[in-house]
From Swiss-Prot:
Function: NDH-1 shuttles electrons from NADH, via FMN and iron-sulfur (Fe-S) centers, to quinones in the respiratory chain. The immediate electron acceptor for the enzyme in this species is believed to be ubiquinone. Couples the redox reaction to proton translocation (for every two electrons transferred, four hydrogen ions are translocated across the cytoplasmic membrane), and thus conserves the redox energy in a proton gradient. This subunit may bind ubiquinone.
GO cellular component: plasma membrane
Keyword annotations: Cell inner membrane, Cell membrane, Membrane, NAD, Quinone, Translocase, Transmembrane, Transmembrane helix, Ubiquinone
Subunit composition and interactions: NDH-1 is composed of 14 different subunits. Subunits NuoA, H, J, K, L, M, N constitute the membrane sector of the complex.
Claim: RNA-binding is one of the keywords in the record: no
Catalysis performed (reactions): a quinone + NADH + 5 H(+)(in) = a quinol + NAD(+) + 4 H(+)(out)
Protein name: NADH-quinone oxidoreductase subunit H
Entry EC no(s): 7.1.1.-
């Protein structure tokens, strides 16, 4: 399915304005709404996790600040702003300061290629999927900088664990996403989404048009849990062993930035799996006879709604698993990656290639 001529990026739309600004400024302006939306959503992701954990443990959770505790996250931000920003005496101050910044930037750079609708995308790169996967390498640098710069053995152990885990699970995750790229015949995330659009709604999604797609779908979801250090793969932050992992020595807003970067990664991988296998911003509702549900629930605003809801669904599953599954051991973690997920991802790759050739 070819892309529609109306698929304009935000930067393209803004470049038509006769304001005489440098194009880079237009790109920055185009990114501002996306950044604010992401920050707002991720900030309340913290509130959502607190409420979900409270439900799992049969308690109320935040209730004091605002109605139903809705302003609790804002209160936490104000509290962190007032906390002392402590830098350990023997720490490498440059690495200690730049580590959280690299993590934050790395988490949000991938948002530039995530299509939030037919026209809501920062940059429709023809290698967008490759870019989104490769951007994880920047986060690895930030984690190492934070762990090494802290001059704390627990922080360093946590950083080494995290880097080994991310690099290892990046292999099955990348191969799983290549299966979706083969089905679509492109690495453009916008084009992958368009290939799954149609009046049949969810029946056009790769997960329902190709029985083999369930295998790379599950492989990527499991790998994404490891890449974001979420339970049961939260070994780099094991409280009973490493205090808090690579951010043990951080306080104040530096701690808040690292925390926010983690939720940014959670939404990023959730959006990627939604785009690769579940139609991204396309509506799940099909047209049934004269009832054109798909047509009525499609368009720019609906597109943003659908991909955000799909992303939030997978974030909910990640939070749910945190309070359901126990933490794996290091040997179990690596065994799962190298002897289970990687071989099965290669099998999925071969089966997908055979499917594409024969269809």
């Amino acid at each position: 399915m070819s892309s529609s001529p109306s698929l304009n990026t935000w930067s393209d739309a803004l470049s038509g304005l006769s304001i005489g600004w440098f194009p880079l400024g237009l790109v920055i302006i185009a990114a501002i709404p996306l950044v604010f939306i992401a920050l707002y959503a991720l900030t309340y992701g913290v509130y959502g996790e607190r409420k979900i954990s409270a439900f799992m443990q049969d308690r109320l959770g935040p209730m004091e600040v605002g109605i139903w505790g809705l302003l609790q996250t804002l209160a936490d931000i104000l509290k962190l702003l007032q906390k002392e920003d402590i830098v350990p005496k023997l720490a490498d101050k440059f690495l200690f300061v730049i580590g959280p910044g690299i993590l934050f930037v790395g988490s949000f750079l991938a948002f530039a290629v995530l299509p939030f609708g037919p026209a809501f995308i920062g940059a429709d790169l023809n290698v967008g999927l490759f870019y989104a996967v490769g951007i994880v390498a920047i986060e690895v640098v930030g984690i190492l900088a934070a762990g090494w710069g802290s001059n704390n053995k627990w922080a360093l152990y946590g950083a080494v664990r995290s880097v080994a885990q991310i690099v290892s699970y990046e292999i099955p995750a990348s191969i799983a996403l290549l299966c979706a790229a083969m089905l679509a015949g492109t690495l453009s995330m916008q084009q992958i989404t368009m290939m799954q659009a149609g009046p049949g709604g969810f029946m056009h999604w790769f997960l329902f048009t190709n029985p083999i797609a369930w295998l790379p779908f599950l492989i990527y979801f499991i790998s994404s849990l490891a890449e974001t250090n979420r339970a049961p793969f939260d070994i780099p932050e094991a409280e009973s062993e490493l205090v808090a992992g690579y951010f043990t020595e951080y306080s104040g807003m530096k701690f808040a930035v690292i925390f926010l970067a983690e939720y940014g990664r959670m939404f990023m991988v959730s959006a990627i799996i939604s785009i690769a296998f579940l139609g991204g911003w396309t509506s799940p509702l099909p047209n049934i006879g004269g009832l054109e549900l798909n047509t009525m629930t499609s368009g720019p605003v609906w597109g943003a709604f659908w991909i955000i809801m799909k992303g939030f669904f997978f974030i909910f599953v990640q939070m749910w698993l945190r309070w359901t599954l126990p933490r794996l051991r290091v040997d179990q973690l690596m065994y799962l990656c190298w002897k289970v997920l990687t071989p099965f991802s290669l099998i999925a790759f071969v089966l997908t290639a055979i499917w594409v050739i024969n269809h």
